[in-house]
Curated annotation (Swiss-Prot):
Motif (AKAP CaM-binding): 76-96
One Gene Ontology biological process: positive regulation of protein localization to plasma membrane
Organism: Homo sapiens
S-palmitoyl cysteine-type lipidated residues: 36, 129
Region (PKA-RII subunit binding domain): 392-405
Membrane topology: Lipid-anchor
UniProt entry tagged with the keyword Metal-binding: no
A GO cellular component entry from the record: dendrite
Protein name listed in UniProt: A-kinase anchor protein 5
Effect of residue 408 to P: Prevents or diminishes RII binding
Basic and acidic residues biased stretches: 8-19, 92-102, 302-333
Chain intervals for the UniProt region annotation (Essential to the intracellular anchoring function): 1-170
Comp. bias regions, Basic residues: 37-48
Gene name of the encoded protein: AKAP5
């Protein structure tokens, strides 16, 4: 029994040494595992008093048990050795539980004392389960703040541009009305030209409004388009004040030629403001001296296009009408004599050629009758109503006779075919 007790003591000492010799590796392993699942400040605070109380209890128990183990008791036998094994196993389990608790407390203290950069690095490497859900939330919050700021700025810019563009557009509307009134007075002399100028005035105002709205959608390019529109509107106003009131078609032509600049500006926001302003001013200066030439060419083109289209349409309609009338007249000319010929010749063709089953005597008599009827008639125009009546009666009688004979022959043939079938079946 003593030998067994001594062996048991030796094994327990080795276990203690092994447990005391490798605390660092266990702590390092348990740090990573515990940090992944228990990284919370509340949990750390709650664990601190528990760990302190458990450490005090273990410290109280350890000296008592150590004193008991130092005293040799060889006389108690096997039950005493079993009890010692159980108590020492409990000690080893309690020591193992104490070490992870200390490992939990130390990283919590280190995490509180460390910098924010170290926290981020540790969280990225060791705690992905906690880091990844927090990251997108913060980014979304920041993105929402940035989007809201940008949208507020864009709205403010849009409101400023709306306020700036409404005033010149209202001025343009009043001037357009005045020019339209003048053009109505001139329309008594040149109706077509003035009507076209009025249409161009209305289209210019609509296109400018559309270009402003499109610029507001593009954000930063809205500022450039708004400034260009305002500058060009000012140049147009100055030119309108300098020119006489009778030059309304000139104004419309200039505005029409300045519109392509507006349409080309929004898709190029990368060009700086100064270059765009210089290009716009150059284009306006170049279009100003050539206004008369543009006017003449536009008026001629606008007058010739509708006239050409109308003439082409009228010529097409006339040609179609002529062809239709010709076709109708030709068809009527062809159909009129054909109808008369059909009514006159069907009977003779039927009697002579198509009536194969008619006996020869009847055909000869029919031919003789027709010859006798038409012998005295040199033409269709010389016939009278009585002759037409006789022709109708004769044709009707001949048709009836032929029909009766054909029906009788068909019946006879059918009877003969039936008899032949019966005979064939009997045979």
């Amino acid at each position: 029994m003593e030998t067994t007790i001594s062996e048991i003591h030796v094994e327990n000492k080795d276990e203690k040494r092994s447990a005391e010799g490798s605390p660092g590796a266990e702590r390092q392993k348990e740090k990573a595992s515990m940090l992944c699942f228990k990284r919370r400040k509340k949990a750390a605070k709650a664990l601190k008093p528990k760990a302190g109380s458990e450490a005090a209890d273990v410290a109280r128990k350890c000296p008592q048990e150590a004193g008991a183990s130092d005293q040799p008791e060889p006389t108690r036998g096997a039950w005493a050795s079993l009890k010692r094994l159980v108590t020492r196993r409990k000690r080893s389990e309690s020591s193992k539980q104490q070490k992870p608790l200390e490992g939990e407390m130390q990283p919590a203290i280190n995490a509180e004392d460390a910098d924010l950069s170290k926290k981020k690095a540790k969280s990225r490497l060791k705690i992905p389960c906690i880091k990844f859900p927090r990251g997108p939330k913060r980014s979304n919050h920041s993105k929402i703040i940035e989007d809201s700021d940008c949208s507020i700025k864009v709205q403010e810019e849009a409101e400023i541009l709306d306020i700036q563009t409404q005033t010149p557009l209202n001025d343009q509307a009043t001037k357009a009305k005045s020019t339209q009134d003048l053009s109505e007075g001139i329309s008594r002399k040149d109706g077509d030209e003035v009507c076209e100028s009025n249409v161009s005035n209305s289209t210019t105002s609509g296109e400018k409004v559309i270009s402003v709205e499109l610029g507001l959608d593009n954000g930063h390019s809205a500022i450039q388009t708004g400034t260009l529109i305002l500058e060009e509107i000012e140049t147009i106003k100055e030119k309108q004040d300098v020119q006489p009131q009778q030059a309304s078609p000139l104004e419309t032509s200039e505005t029409d030629h300045q519109q392509p600049v507006l349409s080309d500006v929004p898709p190029l926001p990368a060009i700086p403001d100064q270059q765009i302003v210089e290009e716009a001013s150059n284009s306006t200066l170049e279009s100003a001296p050539n206004g008369k030439d543009y006017e003449s060419t536009e008026i001629v083109a606008e007058e010739t296009k509708p006239k050409d289209t109308e003439l082409s349409q009228e010529s097409d309609f006339k040609e179609n009408g002529i062809t239709e009338e010709k076709s109708k007249s030709e068809e009527s000319k062809r159909m009129e004599p054909i109808a008369i010929i059909i009514t006159d010749t069907e009977i003779s063709e039927f009697d002579v050629t198509k009536s194969k089953n008619v006996p020869k005597q009847f055909l000869i008599s029919a031919e003789n009758e027709q010859v006798g009827v038409f012998a005295n008639d040199n033409g269709f125009e010389d016939r009278t109503s009585e002759q037409y009546e006789t022709l109708l009666i004769e044709t009707a009688s001949s048709l009836v006779k032929n029909a009766i004979q054909l029906s009788i022959e068909q019946l006879v043939n059918e009877m003969a075919s039936d008899d032949n079938k019966i005979n064939n079946l009997l045979q």
